[in-house]
Amino acid sequence: MYGIEYTTILIFLTSITLLNYTLKSITRIMDYIIYRFLLIVAILATIMNAQNYGVNLPITGSMDTAYANSTQSEPFLTSTLCLYYPVEASNEMADTEWKDTLSQLFLTKGWPTGSVYFKEYTDIAAFSVEPQLYCDYNLVLMKYDSTQKLDMSELADLILNEWLCNPMDITLYYYQQTDEANKWISMGSSCTVKVCPLNTQTLGIGCLITNPDTFETVATTEKLVITDVVDGVNHKLNVTTATCTIRNCKKLGPRENVAVIQVGGANILDITADPTTTPQTERMMRINWKKWWQVFYTVVDYVNQIIQTMSKRSRSLNSSAFYYRV
């Protein structure tokens, strides 16, 4: 009888020992698997980026997230505002402290010191070559000049909208525009653009494809050209490629963190390409021509109302890089 009890106790102790060994083995195996998994995740995390900017897509707009627009809960504490102005403004005011003065005035409207940036440009033509929009909100002041109406309207069309652009090889291929949103945008120090429409036999309509002198000239020595031709018709192009780059672009929609303020002029510029539609005036506004001090005072007074017509972007955007990126 005692032998049976001893055997039972021995079996019980042996079972407990085996169970303990098994549990420890399972624990070691699980620890190994978990640590190995975490090691792999840590290694991959150093290689991979959370946001993918390197897929080599020709996307030049829409790489940002629109935020719900509100100026009621003091979003300026985390927002930046860029104010672009011509050099003649600072020359006229002739005050080395004018930026500090305006910064203090913007503070009274809820914009903390350091959140407003003043960006100077030489003239409309120079600004057209490389319009860089760095801030969450961008206000571009353009003084009206009757001799530069076309340059102003094209610049406004460029920066107030997002464009998807691809390179064009005009030496090898013919091109056609598919719809009203499709435009050819040229930028450079000097852009002369000529076009020759083609028939179904790829023969020139009113021009010789072998002789650029017979092409129709649509732009001469300009810095920014937005070319619109008859949709659905192939064209042979001639462009001063040594000083100009041309891209085949599609208008994606409004760039809602940009507003253009026209200073002076009887009427606000119309950047609507379609003559049958109502002129586009949203985020395109006008201030009566005054001294530049009064212009800036007006901007400060109405800055919050202007921001209400805009939407903040998730990050700043370099318009030049956006245009040229492939």
Curated annotation (Swiss-Prot):
Glycan attachment sites: N69, N238, N318
Positions with a binding annotation for Ca(2+) 2: Q177, D228, V229, D231, D301
Keywords per UniProt: Calcium, Capsid protein, Disulfide bond, Glycoprotein, Host endoplasmic reticulum, Host-virus interaction, Metal-binding, Outer capsid protein, Signal, T=13 icosahedral capsid protein, Virion
Pfam families to which the protein is assigned, alphabetical: VP7 (PF00434)
GPR motif: annotated span: 253-255
Signal peptide limits: 1-50
Any one GO molecular function term: metal ion binding
Subcellular location: Virion; Host endoplasmic reticulum lumen
Annotated S-S bridges: C82-C135, C165-C249, C191-C244, C196-C207
Region (CNP motif): 165-167
Modification after translation: N-glycosylated.
HAMAP family associated with the record: Rota_VP7, Rota_VP7_A
Family membership noted in the UniProt record: Belongs to the rotavirus VP7 family.
Subunit details: Homotrimer; disulfide-linked. 2 Ca(2+) ions bound at each subunit interface in the trimer hold the trimer together. Interacts with the intermediate capsid protein VP6. Interacts with the outer capsid protein VP5*.
Record's protein name: Outer capsid glycoprotein VP7
Organism field: Rotavirus A (strain RVA/Cow/United States/B641/XXXX/G6P7[5])
